[in-house]
């Protein structure tokens, strides 16, 4: 395997992250590898397992700096440390600006791009231009982590590189990384107890159907009858072929529940794993 570096044997100190309930720390290398495995698993759903895995390895490399370790061991008396820019810089040197964006923003959110003149602030260019020397030098990561120099990207990404497709891919990779990081952190600080599996769309649809049966069978008034008709149509419509649909219903027509009914029905019918609700604020 081509790699940016190879592990150099036993390190001179223990590099740590999250304080656990028993008073010990999670090894930083363990966290990096766990997040890489999870991010790769999540990204496999859209053909990016290798890319997700490498992004996970990159995400907390900045914690290998002396200041990063001081912060992990004594957060009450140590200033916050930017531990994300280091991994973003390595990703950029590999030509991987998808991962650079995801890593730079895995706590603060995806950054604006900025321009090469930025030498401060939160833009991606500013983060990539940041000088990481002295106590912020993270190069000790080379004693523990091996970063693949090359990974396979999804074929669909290379097929048509329009801006919307690239932006969506960056967001998907970012989401995989953030979920993986939070899940492994949660497991560590809860004493090794991983979060249980959530309900499947099929099970949620069963619960929804049980909840709305009385409304469908005996609507209380004319308005409720109209709402029930809309709801029933959405439940049936969810079984149509997989695709993009719109729902046009007047105010008071029960759009919230009916749209949920369609989404769960559609997900259950087509083996989809998640329902996302997007709300304008």
Spans of features found by a protein language model:
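Conserved SF1/SF2 helicase motif Ia
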Residues: 265-279
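Short, hydrophobic/aromatic alpha-helical segments in well-folded domains
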Residues: 38, 233, 262-263
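Hydrophobic helix-cap positions at the C-terminus of alpha-helices
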Residues: 42, 46, 237, 266-267
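Residue-level preference for the first positions of well-ordered beta-strands
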Residues: 51, 244-246, 274-276
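Conserved small/polar residues in nucleotide/adenosyl-binding loops
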Residues: 181, 279-281
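Accessory nucleic-acid engagement/destabilization modules that flank
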Residues: 3-211
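Conserved pre-motif I regulatory segment
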Residues: 215-244
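Walker A/P-loop
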Residues: 242-262
């Amino acid at each position: 395997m081509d790699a940016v570096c190879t592990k150099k044997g036993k390190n001179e100190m223990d590099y740590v992250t999250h304080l656990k309930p028993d008073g010990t720390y999670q090894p930083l290398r363990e966290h990096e590898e766990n997040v890489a495995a999870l991010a790769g698993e999540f990204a496999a759903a859209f053909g990016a397992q290798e890319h997700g895995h490498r992004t996970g390895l990159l995400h907390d490399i900045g914690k290998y700096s002396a200041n990063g370790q001081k912060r992990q061991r004594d957060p009450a008396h140590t200033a916050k440390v930017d531990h994300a820019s280091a991994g973003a810089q390595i990703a950029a040197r590999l030509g991987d600006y998808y991962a650079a964006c995801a890593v730079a923003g895995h706590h603060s959110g995806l950054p604006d791009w900025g321009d090469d003149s930025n030498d401060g602030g939160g833009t991606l260019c500013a983060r990539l231009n940041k000088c990481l020397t002295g106590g912020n030098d993270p190069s000790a990561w080379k004693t523990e982590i091996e970063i693949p120099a090359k990974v396979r990207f999804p074929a669909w990404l290379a097929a048509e590189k329009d801006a919307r497709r690239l932006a969506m891919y960056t967001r998907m990779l970012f989401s995989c990384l953030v979920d993986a990081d939070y899940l492994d952190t949660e497991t560590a600080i809860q004493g090794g107890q991983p979060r249980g599996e959530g309900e499947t769309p099929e099970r949620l649809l069963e619960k929804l159907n049980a909840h709305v049966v009385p409304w469908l069978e005996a609507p209380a008034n004319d308005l409720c009858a109209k709402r029930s008709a809309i709801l029933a149509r959405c439940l049936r419509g969810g079984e149509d072929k997989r695709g993009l649909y719109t729902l046009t219903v007047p105010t008071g027509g029960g759009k919230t529940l009916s749209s949920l009914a369609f989404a769960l029905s559609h997900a259950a019918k087509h083996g989809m794993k998640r329902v996302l609700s997007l709300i304008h604020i």
